[in-house]
UniProtKB/Swiss-Prot annotation:
One of its GO terms (molecular function) is DNA binding. One of its GO terms (biological process) is negative regulation of DNA-templated transcription. PROSITE patterns: ATP_CONE. The gene is nrdR. Binds 1 zinc ion. It comes from Shewanella sp. (strain W3-18-1). Belongs to the NrdR family. This is Transcriptional repressor NrdR.
Length: 149
């Protein structure tokens, strides 16, 4: 690792610790040339799969889009940001765990509905009505009946 102060190529690790629930390593380093100390963080680069849209096009996974969809669904509902972040994290973990380079958008939508069903039933119905393109009241009734089982 290059020293950020003098650009020397040789540094030594003084201390290493696991941080972020074991997902990162914090290292305290010292330059062997100028003796300045600095901290580095190392973590695995986790690549999200690409999303195959209904029309067959492919696009990179968009975390912002996922978050905005969930925020829209839970708007004015008693759901904390912490609960939202945990749900989004579960969706991303599940997508990574598939081991696939590409996943269908339906899978992302279904994972979103599954998390919303656990968070807030009204938010689930809101999202499902748009995602499934409900056309009449009977489709709402079917979705509500599914929740009551």
């Amino acid at each position: 690792m290059h020293c950020p102060f003098c650009s020397a190529t040789d540094t030594k690790v003084i201390d290493s610790r696991l941080v972020a629930e074991g997902h990162q390593v914090r290292r305290r380093r010292e330059c062997t040339e100028c003796h300045e100390r600095f901290t580095t963080f190392e973590g695995a680069e986790l690549v999200m799969p690409r999303v195959i849209k209904r029309d067959g096009s492919r696009q990179p996974f968009d975390e912002e889009k996922l978050q905005s969809g969930m925020l829209r669904a839970v708007e004015k509902r008693p759901v904390s940001m912490d609960e939202i972040e945990q749900a989004l994290s579960k969706i991303k973990s599940t997508l990574r765990a598939t081991g696939e380079r590409e996943v269908p958008s339906e899978m992302v939508g279904n994972l979103m509905m599954e998390q919303l069903m656990n968070l807030d039933k009204v938010a689930y119905i809101r999202f499902a009505s748009v995602y499934r393109a409900f056309e009449d009241v009977s489709e709402f009734g079917e979705a509500i009946a599914k929740l009551q089982k």
